[in-house]
Amino acid sequence: QLYNLDSTNMGPEQWQGIAAAVQENYDRYDGFVITHGTDTMGYTAAALSYMIQKSPKPVVLTGSQKSIYNRDTDARNNLWRAVAYACHPDAWGVQIVFDNKVILGTRARKTRTKSFNAFSSIDYPETAMFRDRRLIQFLQRPAEYTHAVFSTALDPNVFVLRLVPGMRADIIPMLEGRYRALVLESFGVGGLPGGDDGAMFAAVRDWCGAGHLAAFTTQVPHEGSDLAVYEVGRAAKALPGVLE
């Protein structure tokens, strides 16, 4: 047992511990199943997807919405399916197995707080699904998944800022000296309030000018961002140090 804690307390240190354990035992086993609380399982799956790349062996995360001690728990079914997928010869990569679905670790997001159907695959097909305890594969193992590449170094000094209407720009200078990168969750396809004349743009410009990174994404779950669509995004996209 690596950890015994509420998944709310999971973070980069634990992600590194899991990745290191998989790396240490990679040649001894054909697959791995990790039980994990659902609240941050999507974060862990995404992190492991980048720390354990191109794995021809499955690294599977699963858990339950109800405790295994409850009569109507989903834990038993989820664990059975996770092990069944990990044992399947066509299984691969970092995946979440939950409520009959197999979802890529980079695409899994918890979209329901109580239902057994807790996770959704965002803007990408599910890898596979279980139907009547039979695995139906939708995505095949990519040809380049022949040897796992482990990259377990992480920089935790990243701040995620979700923009809201009326937010003051002075929050960004307050991050100086504490964080090295900023992830901006913007509106719609992306942009900064006020465009290139606004205080928010100036704050991001100064942030990037100090040698930091600013990565733009969208708060909208589906279809992604595109800073080039509107004027409020184009100026930000042109700044050095801005990623999208």
In which residue ranges do the predicted regions lie?
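Internal gly/pro-rich beta-alpha loop/helix module
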Residues: 61-131
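Accessory alpha-helical/coil subdomains and C-terminal extensions
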Residues: 104-189, 194-195
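Gly/Ser/Thr-rich loops at beta-strand to alpha-helix junctions
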Residues: 36-42, 101-103, 188-191, 222
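ATP/NTP phosphate-donor binding region
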Residues: 1-24, 222
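Short Gly/Thr/Asp-enriched flexible loops that form oxyanion-binding sites at enzyme active sites
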Residues: 37-57, 194-203
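Short, acidic/small-residue loops that bind anionic groups at enzyme active sites
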Residues: 45-74, 83-89, 208-218
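C-terminal non-catalytic interaction/assembly regions of soluble proteins
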Residues: 189-244
